[in-house]
Structures are given as C-alpha cells and as structure tokens.
C-alpha cells in the first residue's frame, strides 16, 4: 500500500514568516514548484482540505493523496541528468562531500504548459542544481527515485520533505510538528497553527501565543549533532541582537529561546512574505528602481549594524529578506535567518557559506572573508530584483565563477594565487612565458569532475553597464524618462561597487547608504517629475520608526537560563529587546525639566514635507542628555506637535500658513507649500501672538550657527515696536558663547505677526571650521512705497516638495543645542519691519533704453524662508544667497545667513592694494516684463559643476548689462567659454519693462547659469564680478582671493549701474567694487573644504525651476506704503575675528580657512559717517543688548561704530 503524504495547509500562498524555504505546493491543477531553501530538501503542502480524509484525534490531518492514484500518464520522467549533491548543508561548517548520481525528476504534466522557460519556479538556492530543461523541475536530489515502485517515492518524500502528525524527531533531526500542539517555555505557551517553512537548521511554524493572543513565528532547530554547534551560535547572535533596536536596524525581532523535547525553539515576530515569494507572486517581473531603493536602504542599514558588531549574516538572499506588511507598509523589509551567521573573528576559509547564486567570489575561491560577503549578496539581490531573474544563477560553483568572470572579468592574479580552491576552476597556462590563471572550459571541468555545465542565465551581459539597457519602462517620457535614465546610471554605479570581486575594494554598508542612488541627490535635477516625487514618497518607509510598545525606560530582560527539574527538558532563555525611547512628542517635549525640549504650539498641519533622511541613522545620532539642556518655547498655545513622530531627530520649522497680500490684515489660514533643502517636518503657525522666550543657556560651546526667527507683519495701521535679539557668538575654541538678556528679549511679539523658525543643519557638514565662523543675520530695511503684489512672482514657480540628503554627523552633534532631538541649533532673532519711504530719490539716473523705475535698490524679499543645506560626505547641496535688484519701489531687505559654510561666497571688500578709479555699482535696468521686480542672486563658487548642462530645463540667456557709459558689459553673442568659471544665478523678474531687443539690452533679472570655463585672473588676484549672458559668478583667481561684490546701494547717489569693457582677451578686466559708506557685518565662509559641493544649484526662468535647488518663495506682507511701519530693526551676529574696519580690505586666508565676507547694510538702517542720524530711527530705546566675551573684536552694542571711510576718496 502506498504511503500517504500528510501535510499542513497554510491559509494563503504567500504566508510565511521567519523562513528561508520555498514552498512546493501540490494542487489539483498541477505542481507549483517555487524553489527551496538552503537546505537539501523540499517540503510540500497543499491548499486543499479534502473532507474525505480522516481526522486525527490530536491533530488536523490535511491534504492526503496517493501517488499511485495519479494516472501513470500524468507522471513525466525527465531525462537522467548528472547532478552534484552536497550531503552536508553548506553553512553547517562541516565538510561537504560531493557525490554524483543520476537523478530522475518528477513533474506534473499540467505544469509544463503553465511555466514559461525563463520562469522556472523551482530555482535551487544553495547546493542544489537547476535542471536546464525549461519546464522540468527537480524535486529531489537524494538517491534516484524508483518510478516503478511508487511506494518508495511516497516513503522517501514522507521521511524527508513532509511533516506528519507524529510528534517525534526524524532521522535528520527535524522536529515533527503537529497542528494545535502546545509548545511550552517556562513563561509562555504557544499553540502551533500551521507549518510555514523549512530552513537549513530547522523548520518554522506559525504559532499563537496564548498569554498575549499574538501571532508569532517559532523556529524549531534540529537536534542533530552536526547542527548543535551552529544552533548555539545562532542563539548567541540573536541574544546579542536583542539588545539592539530591531525596527531601527531592520532585522527580525526575537522574543525568547526555549527547549522543547530536546529541540531549541526560537520565538520571533511574525512577518508576512519574503522577497522571493513576492517576486513569484508578481510572475518574476522586474521591480522598478523606486521600489528597489527602499529595500536596498533598509538591508544596507541592517548590514551596517551587523558590521559594527563584527557579525556576518552569510546567507543573504531574497528568501531571507521579509516584507513586514506589504499592504500597510509597502516595501518595509527586515532581514531574517541568522542561522548561518558568525563572528568575523571566527570565520573559516573552507566553510561553505551563502546560497550559491549570492555567493561571493572569495567563498568560491577559498579566500579569507569578512562582512564584505554580505555586500556581494546584497548586490546580487538588488540585481535580481532589477532583472526579475538571478544575475548569476550558477548550477554549480564552476558555473557561478564562470558567470562572474564572463561578465566582470577574471579575478585578479593575486586573488587566484591565494585561493585554496582556485585549481578547481582555473588552470595555469603553460604556453605563456609566465604563468597566468585561465578559467577552465566547460568541457575541461566536466572531464575532470563529471559535472556538466549548464546555462541558466536569462540575461548574459558582457559587462554590468549593459544592465541599464534592459527592461526600460515604456510609459515614461519627458523628464520622467530623463530621471529614470539618471537613476539607472547611479544604480549601475552602485551595483558595480557592490559586486567588486576584490573584497577589500568592495563598497561598505556605510558608503552604500551615502551613495547617490540611495540619497537621491541626482534626482534633484528633476523636481517637477512625478516619477521623482514617487521615488521620494517610496523612501518614506525608511524613516526611523518606534514600536508601539517601546517605553521611555530601557527595560531589558536578562538573558536567563531557567533550570528545570530533571524530569523536564525545557530550557527557557529570554531575549531582551531594546525598548528605545518612545518618540511620543507630547510627552518628550513636555519633559523640559530635565532636558529642556522645544514646546511648539502648532496647528493646522496642512503643509507637508517629506520626512525622509537619506543617510544612515547611527545610534550616536540619538539625543544626548547632556546636549539638550535648553530650548526655545513658543507660547502661548497647547503642546500640540505633529501627529507623526520625529524619527530623524530634526528641528521643527514653524512656518506661516499664509502671507497676506491685501491692504488689510486677514486671518485666513491657507497652507502654503514650502520647498526646503532640508527634510524637516513643516507645520504652519497660526497668526496669533507668540512670545519668544529664549533661555540664557541656549548657546553652547562651539555653537556658531544661528537660527533666525523672523516676524512678518501683515498690513496693519500701527505696529508695535519689534525687538531684534542678536546674540554674541564669541566662538573662540573652548569658549562658550554668552547671551545677555534684556527686557527687549522677553517682550511679546505683537499680534497678527507670523513667525518663521529657521533651523540650521549647517554644522553637520564634516570638515567645517565650526569654532571660527559665524553666519550673521542682517535685516536691511529700505524705503518702499509700492502696492505691487508679490503673488505674481510667487506663482511663477510651481510649488512642490524638494528633498535633500542630510547626513547626520555624530561628531558634530555633541556640543550643540537641540530641540529635544540632537539637531544643532543656535538662536538669533531678527524682525522684518517695513519702513515708509523716507529717502529722497536719486538725483540722476542712467540712460535707459526703455522706461524703467524711478529708483532702484538692491533688495532681498523680506521673510524669505531659506533652504537648509542637506549634506552628506558625497554631496553638498547649495542654498541661496539672495540679492535682489528691485525697481521703482523699495522694500525691506533681509540678507539672511548663507546656510552652508562650504557653499558659495558673496564677498564685499575693498581691494585697497590695487583699487582702480572706476568703481562699479549695481545696475538699475530692466529686462522685458515689468518694473518693480524682485529677483534673487545666488552665487556659487564651484567651477566644476555641470548641473546646468545636464538640466532638462532651459535657462534664459540674458543680454549684457549696460553701464554708466552705455557700453555693454558683454554682447549677447558671446559664448559661455568667454565667461569666468564661477557662476552667479539670478531668479528672473517676471515684470520688467521691455528693453532693447538688440545687443544693448539691459539685464536686471535673470542671468542664466551655465557651466563656464574658468579664466585665469590677472596676477592671481580676484577677477572681480563679471556679468555675462551665460554666467554671473564671483571668480576667485587664487586660493586666497576674496571677491568684491557690493550688496547695498547709496540712495543719495544715482542709481547704481555696472559696466565693464570686454576685450578680445577672455580674461576679464579687474573689477572694482563700489562700497557704500555703510556699516557691514562680516560673513564667514569656508572655501577650501575637500567636501565642497560638486553639484551646485542653478536657477532657470519661471516657471521652469532649477532642477537641483528648492523653490524660493516670497512670503511677503503687502507692500502698500500707507500700511508700512516706520522703523526697522537690525540683528547682527559677528564673529570674533571680524575686523572693526568693516569697509576696509580684509585679510586673505589660505583656502583651507574661512573667508571674511562683509555684507553692506542699507544706509537707512545704521548710523554711519555718511548717514544723518535723522535717517536712522533707533528702535531700541535704552540699553545695549549685544554682549561680548572678553577679547572679542566685535561690536557690543548700539549704536554701531561708524564705518571707516578714509580709504574711499570717491565716496
């Protein structure tokens, strides 16, 4: 009588948990062989529950079938094929013995027509072989099945591949599960629900934890002696991992370990589906890169953690990467199965590790290995996801190394010579004068070993670069297609680094996380692409997450061993999981008594920004209790924070929901999308009065970066006095900065104002001189009487989310104030108050070719929300330095901080040594749309950026500026090569008067950015500021050059204009800077950083926005002169090395040091030698509010010292 196969039935095809096995399902329609695990055998189960089968008393008997019951014609005998069978599991540590046998394979006839040749679901994943026949699947590789004796087939399958209802150990050491059986530990009991899968060292069952009624997965290890040692290693590794945050580092959470009937049982969280089953469910179709990226990021994060612990997973493959919850958390994955894991110090060269398709060359060749083998496996996994088929599906190790060598070239000679197993696959060529290794031909290998080589590849590539051409999506076009091609280039670049044959040169998990494919900085060139937006949305799943039962206190259960009486064989060991701090912001931010947190009153959270940080999340980036000592409190209001947690420990931005453009104030709340260059949570702020309370210790030692808080006033008849609170930053190394508070600091801001809280992430840049650089904040009000609305300009740019890469540097997060999150913050306060027209019009104008505005001033939009600098060791995204020529009417000016020290420099200095007589002023001219325009100038100093050339968006080429003499600075026909190497970017004005269409057209708006060839400057000095149709950039001739660029305009003089004669010599003449007699604040920047940005932003005319930069939005209050305030305020943050001779020449420094960048301040604001006291209404009636440490050379109070103008005879 034929033996009956009794198997358990899972509820669905995709149900699996902590298992590395593929399922062989036996269904009436045919056999669906979905592969197998790293073990040498399969298991079978069925979805059908025949009602005619008998029921066992204590177990549920299912899927009973007789092989003889099948028609003999339904059994197809495959031709005899030679196979290699490794009797011992590869990763068991025991020696593998190879035997050769003729294996008869068995398949169901109806399955032949269902499987495509390339979709062989019965892929062997470790030591087994793949039959080359397209539809015949190998079921067993044990002694040949005797087809003439069906009972033998059933018996063999019963003992090796199927679980029965008997609850006893098999000869292989597997525990025989019984459904509804109770597995008991010392503290919990688990009921077996169903069989999930079989792995190398045991099997996995889905169980029900009775005490908590939760579903868990229990891995029951074999009790065979050969697996005992590896089982102990797995238990010890899981015990070590249990002290880490499993959700943060993306590996399976383990609960406890216990003994049941002499079998070690490991309890894990229940996961849904592995990647192989997911691919199979989708018919092995290629996975788009936007889905591969989050999987890669999460697995690389897990490998990064394992590497830091000195652990090797050694069996990374799609089967061991589990989808946590495909429905609610798409592409949220975790790494499972540490049964093959080992410590790097205990790695043995001769050990068989890894499934063959994902086996690193050093394992195949018998070389010493380390954690780098996991990176090779991960590269093979992401290649398989991309192709839908394994990249190197070798049927044997020879085929595996042959595939690798054909695509990537032979391993280096020194690797082949050092390998202990090299001679199995390579020969030395005796015909050459010196011995070189040569791969054996398939015939030679077959002759030596008797193993026939097979071809199982779906794609055969001559090199990995060819992968970019396959499976190109046909539904993408335009910018989406350009973004996809750019994404593929970065993907291939990373893949080649992961699949480097030499393990010493292979990319590490940390570098993988910082690669552009993961950080997506290359996609910033396509901000308007829906495809790119979906890429960023998919990476949301990579945010740090905290489990619901994590508590504030780290409660660690000890790893205990419960010694039971001799009558019991149970051994219980409890895995302790790190219960990290709950990021429940309401509770965390309320705990300001110990570590003062920032309590922000937020409401109407209709401004969304992607909370994705595209770098690794090291544990050292966690909040440091000694750092978060003080905070900023915005009151009154409830302690209501965003509903989401703050996984990246970032600062919040309090952003105004709307900026009124009418003549009277309004309370309408309308969320305004903000494009920031830093991924931080954005929430709108209600326009209610918000007092700012700044605690005295808000600045800590080494903190040099201010956080600017600006208040924007709507149109109201009267405005209460505003208070600017600049803090002295005496940033000498080792000296804490001091803040002197006055009554002005603690007075409430007036009602109806809107606050912008700008966090700073600039100190995260590595290599930045933090202790000697200050980014000051200046408020420069100019007279303005226009009623022109700014909504038109704002609408010129489409509003979308901009994302950036913020690489949190742990070394830079130690001495900075945090808002309960370890985000480095310093606070400086500045208010923007509009001032009525008070200055007289200029006495003369330049000749214009078209009607222009009566006055021209260099201005910056008030309340510009400046993008933060996102940085990683590989890329620094620049931000904006905003200067604006505004025509006809004047508006208050803010020159906020340049957010990034290593970014562009706007330098204003007087070259006292080689000053020439002709001084240049900013031109007051028009382009073609309107007067009363507001433009932005961004100066970047990286000459090697090709962002503008690769941009899919056109940039307008402007005609040259006209100077005082009416001559052109440069003709419109001049090529970009004639320009200078650096680049200045100006956002175009949308309304300018239509000027001459000839070459004499004047430009006050956009000067499109373009990569221009650097031109050597005269005598190694500064080549000045050259304005060309294609580039307007500050060129530094030498490492110590500092550029003159005037940022202000004397209202008493004529409208400033710039002119420069260009000769045939491409080297520009030396340009002089007109420096107004104004007080100036030194800006400190860094130029010589090796981490200087290589990809710089560039602006394009509206509506086509720059691909690599965030949108600049104008959050401006109405511009009617009747509703403007009459006073303004100024907040200066000075660096100690700032010279008091602000208008004088500044000492140049080596390129490795910071450069002084003095920024001029409008004459209507500060007292200076040339400005009458009546022109400046001092806003702070009484006491000085700037405190200074001893030894500082900066000003310590109002009024500021007058500018030394003795050097400027022309003023």
UniProtKB/Swiss-Prot annotation:
Coiled-coil annotated spans: none
Function description: Serine/threonine-protein kinase involved in transcription regulation and TNF-mediated cellular apoptosis. Plays a role as a corepressor for homeodomain transcription factors. Phosphorylates DAXX and MYB. Phosphorylates DAXX in response to stress, and mediates its translocation from the nucleus to the cytoplasm. Inactivates MYB transcription factor activity by phosphorylation. Prevents MAP3K5-JNK activation in the absence of TNF. TNF triggers its translocation to the cytoplasm in response to stress stimuli, thus activating nuclear MAP3K5-JNK by derepression and promoting apoptosis.
Annotated gene: Hipk1
CDD domains, A to Z: STKc_HIPK1
Any one Pfam family match given in the protein's UniProt record, by short name: Pkinase
Motif Nuclear localization signal 1 (NLS1): chain residues: 844-847
Protein name per UniProt: Homeodomain-interacting protein kinase 1
EC nos: 2.7.11.1
């Amino acid at each position: 009588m034929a033996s009956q196969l009794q198997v358990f039935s899972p509820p669905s095809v995709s149900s699996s948990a902590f298992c590395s096995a593929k399922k062989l399902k036996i269904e009436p329609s045919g056999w669906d062989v979905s592969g197998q695990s790293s073990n040498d055998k399969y298991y079978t189960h069925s979805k059908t529950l025949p009602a005619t089968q008998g029921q066992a008393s204590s177990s549920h008997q299912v899927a009973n079938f007789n092989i003889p019951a099948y028609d003999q014609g339904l059994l197809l005998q495959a031709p005899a094929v030679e196979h290699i069978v490794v009797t011992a599991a590869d990763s068991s540590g025991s020696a593998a013995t190879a035997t050769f046998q003729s294996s008869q394979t068995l398949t169901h006839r109806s399955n032949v027509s269902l499987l495509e040749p390339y979709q062989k679901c019965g892929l062997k994943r470790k030591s087994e072989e793949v039959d080359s026949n397209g539809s015949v699947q190998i079921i067993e590789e044990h002694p040949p099945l005797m087809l003439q004796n069906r009972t033998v087939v059933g018996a063999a399958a019963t003992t090796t591949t199927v679980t029965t209802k008997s609850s006893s150990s098999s000869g292989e050491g597997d525990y025989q599960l019984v459904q509804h059986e109770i597995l008991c530990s010392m503290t919990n009991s688990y009921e077996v629900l169903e069989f999930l899968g079989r792995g190398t060292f045991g099997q996995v069952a889905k169980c029900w934890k009775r005490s908590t009624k939760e579903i868990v997965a229990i891995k029951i290890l074999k009790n065979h002696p050969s697996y005992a040692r590896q089982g102990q290693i797995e238990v010890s590794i899981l015990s070590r991992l249990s002290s880490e945050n499993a959700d943060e580092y993306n590996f399976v959470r383990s609960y406890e370990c216990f003994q049941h009937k002499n079998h070690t049982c490991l309890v894990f969280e229940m996961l849904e589906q592995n990647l192989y089953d997911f691919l199979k469910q989708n018919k092995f179709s290629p996975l788009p890169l936007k889905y591969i990226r989050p999987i890669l990021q999460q697995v690389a994060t897990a490998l990064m953690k394992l590497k830091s612990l000195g652990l090797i997973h050694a069996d990374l493959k799609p089967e061991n990467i589990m989808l946590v919850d495909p429905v609610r958390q798409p592409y949220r994955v975790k790494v499972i199965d540490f049964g093959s894991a080992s410590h790097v110090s205990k790695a043995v060269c001769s050990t068989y590790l890894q499934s063959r398709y994902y086996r690193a060359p050093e394992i195949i060749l018998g070389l010493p290995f380390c954690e780098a083998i996991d990176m090779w496996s991960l590269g093979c996994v992401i290649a398989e996801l991309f192709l839908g088929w394994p990249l190197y599906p070798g049927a044997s190790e020879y085929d595996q190394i042959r595939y690798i060598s054909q695509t990537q070239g032979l391993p280096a000679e020194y690797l082949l010579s050092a390998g202990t197993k090299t001679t199995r696959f390579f020969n030395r060529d005796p015909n050459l004068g010196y011995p070189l290794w040569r791969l054996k031909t398939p015939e030679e290998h077959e002759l030596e070993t008797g193993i026939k080589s097979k071809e199982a590849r779906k794609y055969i590539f001559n090199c990995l670069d060819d992968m970019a051409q396959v499976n190109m999506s046909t539904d993408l076009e335009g910018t989406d297609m350009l973004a996809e091609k750019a994404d593929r280039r970065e993907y291939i670049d990373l893949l080649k680094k992961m699949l480097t044959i030499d393990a010493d040169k292979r990319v590490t998990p940390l570098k993988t996380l910082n690669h552009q494919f993961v950080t997506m900085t290359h996609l910033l060139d396509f901000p308007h692409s829906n495809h790119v937006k979906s890429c960023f949305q998919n990476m949301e799943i990579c945010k740090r997450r905290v489990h619901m039962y994590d508590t504030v206190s780290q409660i660690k259960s000890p790893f205990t061993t419960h010694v039971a009486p001799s009558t019991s064989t149970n051994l219980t060991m409890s895995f302790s999981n790190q219960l990290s701090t709950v990021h429940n912001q309401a509770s965390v931010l309320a705990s300001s008594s110990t570590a003062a947190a920032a309590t922000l009153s937020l409401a109407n959270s209709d401004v969304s920004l992607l909370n994705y940080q595209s770098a690794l999340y090291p544990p050292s980036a966690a909040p440091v209790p000694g750092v978060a000592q003080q905070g900023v409190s915005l009151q009154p209001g409830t302690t209501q924070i965003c509903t989401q947690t703050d996984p990246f420990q970032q600062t919040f931005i309090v952003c105004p929901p709307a900026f009124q453009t009418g003549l009277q104030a309004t309370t309408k709340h309308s969320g305004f999308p903000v494009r920031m260059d830093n991924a931080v949570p954005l929430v709108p702020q209600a326009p209610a009065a918000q007092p700012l309370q700044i605690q005295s210790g808000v600045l800590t030692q080494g903190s040099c970066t201010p956080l600017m808080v600006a208040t924007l006033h709507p149109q109201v008849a009267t405005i209460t006095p505003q208070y600017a609170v600049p803090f002295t930053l005496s940033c000498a190394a080792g000296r804490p900065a001091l803040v002197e508070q006055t009554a002005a600091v603690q007075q409430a801001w007036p009602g109806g104002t809107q606050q912008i809280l700008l966090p700073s992430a600039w100190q995260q840049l590595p290599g930045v001189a933090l202790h000697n650089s200050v980014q000051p904040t200046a408020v420069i009000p100019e007279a303005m009487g226009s009623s022109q609305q700014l909504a038109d300009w704002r609408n010129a740019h489409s509003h979308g989310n901009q994302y950036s890469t913020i690489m949190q540097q742990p070394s830079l997060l130690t001495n900075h104030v945090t808002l309960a999150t370890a985000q480095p913050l310093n606070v400086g306060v500045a208010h923007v108050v509009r001032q009525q027209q008070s200055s007289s019009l200029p006495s003369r104008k330049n000749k214009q070719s078209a009607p222009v505005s009566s006055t021209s001033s260099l201005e910056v939009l008030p309340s510009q929300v400046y993008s933060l600098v996102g940085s990683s060791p590989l890329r620094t995204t620049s931000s904006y330095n905003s200067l604006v020529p505004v025509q006809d009417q004047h508006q208050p000016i803010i020159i906020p901080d340049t957010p990034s020290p290593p970014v562009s420099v706007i330098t204003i200095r007087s070259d006292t040594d080689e000053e020439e007589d002709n001084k240049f002023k900013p031109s007051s001219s028009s382009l073609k749309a309107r007067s009363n325009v507001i433009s932005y100038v961004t100066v970047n100093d990286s000459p090697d950026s090709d962002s503008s050339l690769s941009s899919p968006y056109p940039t307008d080429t402007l005609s040259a500026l006209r100077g005082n003499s009416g001559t052109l600075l440069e003709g419109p026909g001049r090529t970009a090569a004639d320009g200078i190497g650096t680049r200045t970017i100006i956002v175009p004005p949308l309304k300018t008067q239509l000027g001459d269409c000839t070459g004499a057209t004047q430009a006050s708006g956009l000067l499109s950015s373009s990569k221009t060839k650097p031109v050597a400057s005269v005598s190694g000095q500064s080549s000045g500021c050259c304005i060309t149709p294609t580039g307007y950039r500050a060129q530094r001739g030498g490492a110590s050059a500092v550029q003159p660029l005037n940022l202000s305009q004397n209202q008493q003089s004529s409208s400033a204009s710039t002119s420069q004669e260009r000769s045939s010599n491409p080297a520009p003449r030396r340009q002089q800077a007109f420096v107004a007699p104004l007080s100036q604040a030194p800006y400190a920047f860094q130029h010589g950083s090796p981490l200087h940005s290589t990809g710089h932003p560039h602006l394009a005319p509206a509506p086509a926005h720059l691909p690599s930069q965030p949108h600049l939005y104008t959050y401006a209050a109405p511009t009617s002169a009747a509703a403007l305030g009459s006073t303004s305020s100024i907040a200066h943050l000075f660096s100690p090395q700032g010279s008091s001779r602000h208008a004088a020449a500044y000492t140049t420094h080596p390129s490795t040091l910071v450069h002084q960048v003095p920024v001029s301040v409008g004459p209507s604001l500060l007292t200076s030698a040339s400005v009458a006291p009546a022109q400046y209404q001092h806003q702070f009636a009484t006491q000085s509010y700037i405190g200074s440490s001893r030894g500082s050379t900066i000003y310590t109070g109002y009024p500021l010292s007058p500018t030394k103008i003795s050097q400027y005879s022309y003023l």
